[in-house]
Amino acid sequence: MQLFKERRVLTVSALTALVRGLLEENFEQVWVEGEISNLACPQSGHCYFTLKDAGAQIRCVMFRGAFRSLKFTPRDGMRILTRGRLTLFEPRGEYQLVADYLEPQGIGGLQMAFIQLKEKLAKEGLFSELHKIEIPKLPRRIGIVTSPTGAAIRDILTVLNRRFTNVELLISPVRVQGEGAAREIADAIDDLNRVGNIDVMIVGRGGGSLEDLWAFNEEVVARAIHRSKVPVISAVGHEIDFTIADFVADLRAATPSAAAELVVASKKELTAEVEALSHRLHVSQQRRLERSRALVTALSRAITDPSRVLGHLAQRVDSLDARLVREAGLILDDASERIVTLTARLSRQTPALTLKRWEERLATLSLRLDHAMTRRLACAAESVGLATGTLNAVSPLATLSRGYSITRKLPARSVVTSSRQLAPGDRVEVSFAAGSALCTVEQASRESDSLTAPPRSV
């Protein structure tokens, strides 16, 4: 009885609350590695998955705020390292891990996010050369998107001042790292597009770690560069650094200084090129002037001696006159010969000759037709005579004329060919060569029997 009195009875809810308190107090932050399975991310924005290894598994949840801060997209089968706290989900009595950080095993989370976004944008065609805009050779107005206090802007300005000072710069200051930097960069690109009269745009920053450069790996920056109507030069980090912005931009520069060198030509180089063009123009003008002088000299000679010009013209007139006479004679000869030929052909093809030939052909054909019809009628008459003789030979009328008769059994009028078809009392019709008679059968004998006339009564 004493033992029963000291028993402490707990409800399920109370026990669950105690266990939850113990878990949350002793496992406030733990690091767990395993493989993701049963990943589900509903519209609420929270993410649910199971973390497992060969011997066990644990349910995990990552709430919307923490999930949105991930730089990569978790997938089933991915091995990860996660940080979180243990708690108990009281409605089901299951303990679970509330994760606030995920990192892929074997590769950093940022690197994984870089690879995933690069593959996604490549499939959409954002890196295609078809979307690249040509960089102008002599821009008058250049837009720059970078930090106003970083080394990148100083390098760009130094190179531009050294190479070509006659260019207008429009600087859009932004943060180039940290939270919100990517959004600022994208907005600055859009703003410079709205300003108008911008010939080319440099977007970049100096070197740094992958985390420092990450703003230029964000999707929002990539899409802003892609939709820009102004050609964009990406100049992020050092030569070995590559960002998503580099792949989307119309041109990639290894450094901000290199971007400045690409966007404008050196003033010395332009001066040398102008001098070379001036020299070529001078040489061309000199040659043209020399040709004009030679032409003037030749014309001057002709003008100073008109008789020479008239002599040449008279000689050419004589030559053309002789040629005209010769060509006219040839043309007339050809025409005469053609007239003779056509006259001969016409005489052979007069309507009278043609009509005569057709009359002769008609007479010949008529004669042939008469002969053919005569032969055909003679053959037909002979065939009719033969058929008539044959028909008379087999005609029943011819047989009847020789004393024979045809007997038909009534009432069907079927021809009787044997005495077996008849019986005493049958009515028959006997046809002769002239007329017929109705008779009654009194006796029918077999072929070998002879008929006996019935006795007559006197």
From Swiss-Prot:
<dbReference type="InterPro" id="IPR003753">
    <property type="entry name" value="Exonuc_VII_L"/>
</dbReference>
<dbReference type="Pfam" id="PF02601">
    <property type="entry name" value="Exonuc_VII_L"/>
</dbReference>
<dbReference type="GO" id="GO:0008855">
    <property type="term" value="F:exodeoxyribonuclease VII activity"/>
</dbReference>
<dbReference type="InterPro" id="IPR025824">
    <property type="entry name" value="OB-fold_nuc-bd_dom"/>
</dbReference>
<keyword id="KW-0540">Nuclease</keyword>
<keyword id="KW-0963">Cytoplasm</keyword>
<keyword id="KW-0378">Hydrolase</keyword>
<keyword id="KW-0269">Exonuclease</keyword>
<dbReference type="GO" id="GO:0003676">
    <property type="term" value="F:nucleic acid binding"/>
</dbReference>
<comment type="similarity">
    <text>Belongs to the XseA family.</text>
</comment>
<dbReference type="InterPro" id="IPR020579">
    <property type="entry name" value="Exonuc_VII_lsu_C"/>
</dbReference>
<comment type="subunit">
    <text>Heterooligomer composed of large and small subunits.</text>
</comment>
<dbReference type="GO" id="GO:0009318">
    <property type="term" value="C:exodeoxyribonuclease VII complex"/>
</dbReference>
<protein>
    <recommendedName>
        <fullName>Exodeoxyribonuclease 7 large subunit</fullName>
        <ecNumber>3.1.11.6</ecNumber>
    </recommendedName>
</protein>
<comment type="function">
    <text>Bidirectionally degrades single-stranded DNA into large acid-insoluble oligonucleotides, which are then degraded further into small acid-soluble oligonucleotides.</text>
</comment>
<dbReference type="GO" id="GO:0006308">
    <property type="term" value="P:DNA catabolic process"/>
</dbReference>
<dbReference type="Pfam" id="PF13742">
    <property type="entry name" value="tRNA_anti_2"/>
</dbReference>
<dbReference type="GO" id="GO:0005737">
    <property type="term" value="C:cytoplasm"/>
</dbReference>
